[in-house]
Structures are given as C-alpha cells and as structure tokens.
C-alpha cells in the first residue's frame, strides 16, 4: 500500500465511521495495543487478509489521534506477529493525515494448507480466530477440524466404515431411489 492509498483509506473509514471484514482500527496514540492476536489470527485465516489502521480512535467516532511512535509501534506489532503460528509477516505503511502520523499493517492471508493461524501462547483451540464483519470471533472446534482435515486430506464422506456391511442397506429404498 502506498501512503496516498493509506490516506484514502483513512478518509473512507472516517466517512463511513465503520470497520469491516478486512479493516480493523486501533488508536495507538498512548502505546501499542496489547492484544492484536485475535485480529492477526482472523485476518490471516481469511482469503483476503486484512489491514489494521493505527492512529484512529473508534471511541471518538474514528477521529485521527495519531500514533505515539511509528518506529516503536512497528517493532512491537512485529513482536506480536512473531508469536503467531505460522508467523505473520505484516507489511507497514505510514502517512501523515491532518497533522498526525497514521500507520497501517497489512496482514496477508496464510495459505489454506497452513491454517488455522493462531496465537501460540493460547494454543490452537483457544488462539484461533475468524473474522465476522468487524468482529474477531474464536473459531469453533468444527472450524479448526475443517482446516486440520483439509491438511490431512481427510474426506469423511469417502471413508470406509469397518463396522458397516451390505446387510445394513435397504435394498427396496435404494431401488426406489435409483428407478
């Protein structure tokens, strides 16, 4: 993302006063947000990835409040990215908007064979998230299982069931279905 594109994105966020499926806003004028893990996970686990915009305050109607220290913010966000599995490689862009510094972190999508991306400190079942609208929600056991079975090439609908045999089939029902 170029600085001018970040400026346009900031204008759009301020105009719509909303986050979205691919946009998360964090104030960051008093320091780096402590917990980005849920957003890092949810953006990494969707095909489109996402963008975290630092320097707008949602509680003030998405007012530009700036970033406390651009260099330190990028360093600390990268530290949080390194605590994900697989590691997230954010792409940073900075710009000045209405006299304050704004920073974005583009979070790329993780290849589906490596999903779910999760926070190592919480483990796969508690640290995996999915994005729904503007919310980062914990993945269900089923969602995690779906990714894991995809990786293992498990096709539950094609697996033979050892305890099943032809005597369990309703021959008349099958004939009616086929004919």
Predicted segment positions?
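Conserved N-terminal catalytic/coupling substructures associated with nucleotide/phosphate chemistry
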Residues: 1-179
């Amino acid at each position: 993302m170029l600085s001018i594109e970040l400026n346009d994105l900031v204008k759009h966020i301020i105009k719509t006063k909303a986050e979205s499926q691919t946009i998360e806003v964090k104030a960051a004028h008093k320091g780096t947000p402590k917990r980005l893990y849920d957003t890092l996970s949810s953006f990494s686990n969707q095909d489109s990835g996402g963008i975290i915009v630092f320097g707008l305050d949602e509680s003030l109607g998405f007012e530009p409040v700036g970033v406390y220290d651009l260099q330190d913010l990028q360093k600390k966000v990268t530290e949080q990215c390194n605590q994900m599995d697989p590691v997230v490689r954010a792409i940073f862009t900075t710009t000045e908007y209405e006299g304050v510094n704004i920073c974005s972190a583009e979070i790329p999508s993780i290849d589906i064979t490596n999903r779910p991306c999760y926070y190592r400190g919480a483990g796969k079942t508690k640290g995996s998230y999915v994005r729904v609208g503007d919310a980062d929600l914990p993945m269900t056991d089923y969602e995690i299982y779906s990714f894991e079975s995809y990786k293992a090439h498990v096709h539950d609908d094609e697996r033979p069931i050892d305890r099943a045999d032809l005597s369990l089939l309703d021959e008349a029902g099958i004939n009616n279905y086929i004919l």
